[in-house]
UniProtKB/Swiss-Prot annotation:
InterPro entries: Metalthion_15p. GO terms for molecular function: metal ion binding. Pfam families: Metallothio_2 (PF01439). Metallothioneins have a high content of cysteine residues that bind various heavy metals. Belongs to the metallothionein superfamily. Type 15 family. The keyword Metal-binding applies. Keywords: Metal-binding, Metal-thiolate cluster. This is Metallothionein-like protein 4B.
Amino acid sequence: MSCGGSCNCGSCGCGGGCGKMYPDLAEKITTTTTTATTVLGVAPEKGHFEVMVGKAAESGEAAHGCSCGSSCKCNPCNC
């Protein structure tokens, strides 16, 4: 990382790991206690609609990250 842990690209402010959309929330997220509930059972097979919605979600902002490139710029700038 060539920019000392922070770089900015539009609304994307990359901090600590240079891949987080909102680096200031990282501390709040890591200190929050969460519990998980696992439900075991049988579910119907995914239909065409659910598959398409899942693919659309994967191609959105959540699927793209920023990494710190040269001159303190996010690379790629697609977050």
